[in-house]
């Protein structure tokens, strides 16, 4: 697909849609999903919360469980960009439940990682550590060893921030 072979062109193409809000619900949902994937690749901004809420409603009625979990992750991240952390956590919890019910462990790992990031941002390193550990177990279950290593690194960071450097070192060495 163009998204994988040339993400910059995908970004330009998606950006050429002047007013995405004028798209039908189906097309807006697809635009949001593709824009989220481009954001993951190029580290660009996600669609706005209102757009993602429409996409979420569409996927809830017409999408697969994987699509519902993925759009929930994007919506949560968009809430974080808007500094609406409580709303983000609520959406992440719903998306995690959907991902686990559909046994999409890789997606569950990413959702838990973003939840851990929120706890980290709030300075709640104990809850952050637990979420990163949960993410690591889901990544391992999905066979995503690269993301599993990053989650272990994040567990180590949480221990380091909690002044448990000996334990932090153990996790950082596991991640390596």
Predicted ranges, named:
Residues 1-176:
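A "functional boundary" signal
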């Amino acid at each position: 697909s163009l998204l994988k072979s040339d993400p910059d062109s995908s970004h330009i193409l998606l950006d050429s849609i002047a007013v995405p809000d004028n798209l039908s619900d189906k097309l807006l949902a697809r635009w949001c999903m593709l824009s989220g994937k481009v954001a993951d690749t190029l580290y660009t901004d996600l669609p706005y919360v209102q757009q993602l809420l429409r996409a979420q409603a569409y996927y809830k009625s017409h999408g697969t469980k994987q699509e519902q979990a993925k759009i929930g992750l994007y919506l949560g991240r968009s809430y974080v960009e808007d500094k609406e952390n409580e709303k983000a956590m609520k959406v992440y919890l719903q998306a995690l439940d959907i991902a686990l019910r559909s046994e999409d462990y890789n997606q569950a790992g990413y959702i838990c990682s973003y939840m851990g990031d929120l706890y980290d941002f709030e300075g709640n390193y104990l809850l952050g550590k637990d979420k990163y550990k949960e993410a690591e177990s889901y990544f391992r279950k999905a066979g995503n060893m690269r993301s599993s290593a990053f989650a272990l690194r994040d567990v180590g960071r949480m221990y380091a921030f909690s002044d448990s450097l000996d334990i932090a070192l153990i996790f950082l060495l596991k991640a390596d």
